[in-house]
Regions:
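ATP-dependent carboxylate-amine ligase
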Residues: 2-180
């Protein structure tokens, strides 16, 4: 909106501004819709805090009135363990199906991170979660269960093109997984 105001004040016609904006890509990794040939939508977002996850899930709910929301989410290793149960609670509360998986586990075991996430949920809530440690497998399975009109949100890594495991950054790109 600010860009529109500035360019218009410089004498550029609104029609030309609208035309230019229609071809502009959004911010990579922020509510980024990945164009696929499927009848469901895949969105990638960097949401790696409880607030960010809640905000992007609210956005998904606003644009997706009829289909299911399927959320793939993990939490980073060697980072604030206190947010893990909060992230889990938000994902389960705001999604129809949830997959817990790896993010950047760093020096922690993925299963330990997932267990910290599960600790924030009741037994009934845990029944709505599928835990798949391998992020690629979790993404593929989430897409496999998606149906027409659903939105698959892949949260946590956004624009990142690596996964940090035991001090090594391995090439990993959520978008590449979706497009294969």
């Amino acid at each position: 909106l600010c860009a529109i105001g500035i360019t218009h004040s410089l004498g550029i016609k609104l029609h030309d501004i609208a035309k230019a904006l229609s071809t502009a890509d959004g911010v990579k990794g922020r509510a980024e819709v990945v164009r696929t040939d499927t009848d469901y939508t895949v969105m990638i977002d960097y949401a790696h805090t409880p607030d960010a996850l809640e905000n992007v899930l609210n956005t998904v709910k606003e644009i997706n009135k009829s289909g299911k929301t399927i959320c793939v989410v993990g939490c980073g290793g060697n980072r604030d363990k206190g947010k893990r149960p909060m992230m889990a609670k938000i994902a389960v509360k705001m999604s129809d199906e949830v997959f817990f998986t790896a993010d950047n586990p760093r020096d922690e075991e993925v299963k330990d991170i997932i267990n910290d996430m599960l600790a924030g949920l009741s037994e009934d809530e845990q029944m709505n979660v599928t835990c798949i440690e391998d992020r690629k497998e979790a993404i593929l399975e989430a897409c496999n269960v998606a149906e027409k009109g659903d939105v698959v949100l892949i949260a946590g890594k956004g624009h990142e093109t690596y996964q940090e495991i035991k001090g090594v950054k391995h090439h990993f790109d959520d978008k590449e997984i979706i497009l294969k």
